[in-house]
């Protein structure tokens, strides 16, 4: 698939100053396999609860970061067997971090159903960079 410069018809995920083309990431995984990502059959989900709470915030409390999803879609149209996509984030200082760039609806459903694990792909730094879209394009 050839992407337009603006990724207008691509599925993308944006978080603060970063944006990724999910279509590109999936294409790289299909084409390059382990050069693009490492498959993990059971990734722990409980650490994501802080970003995707199962219940609304208590009155008087504010969440600084919250991933917004369509709850009805998450519970009725997601397939939990499809691996989520996780991208490494290299900070200016300190250890690398990671972020879910595709699969937040699946994470929500899994957590609502009491599951603690889902399969995931961890992109390599190469695939993360190839999938990243400059935020000023969109």
Task: Kindly label every feature range from the protein language model.
Residues 1-41, 59, 116-138:
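Surface-exposed, charge/polar-rich loops and edge strands
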């Amino acid at each position: 698939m050839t992407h337009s410069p603006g990724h207008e018809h691509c599925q993308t995920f944006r978080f603060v100053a970063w944006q990724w083309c999910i279509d590109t990431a999936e294409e790289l995984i299909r084409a390059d396999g382990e050069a693009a990502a490492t498959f993990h059959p059971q990734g722990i989900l409980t650490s994501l609860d802080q970003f995707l709470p199962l219940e609304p915030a208590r009155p008087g409390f504010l969440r600084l970061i919250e991933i917004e999803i369509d709850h009805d879609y998450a519970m009725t149209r997601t397939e939990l067997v499809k691996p989520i996509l996780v991208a490494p984030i290299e900070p200016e200082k300190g250890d690398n971090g990671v972020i879910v760039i595709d699969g937040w609806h699946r994470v929500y459903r899994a957590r609502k159903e009491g599951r603690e694990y889902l399969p995931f792909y961890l992109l390599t730094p190469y695939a993360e960079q190839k999938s990243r879209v400059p935020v000023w394009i969109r």
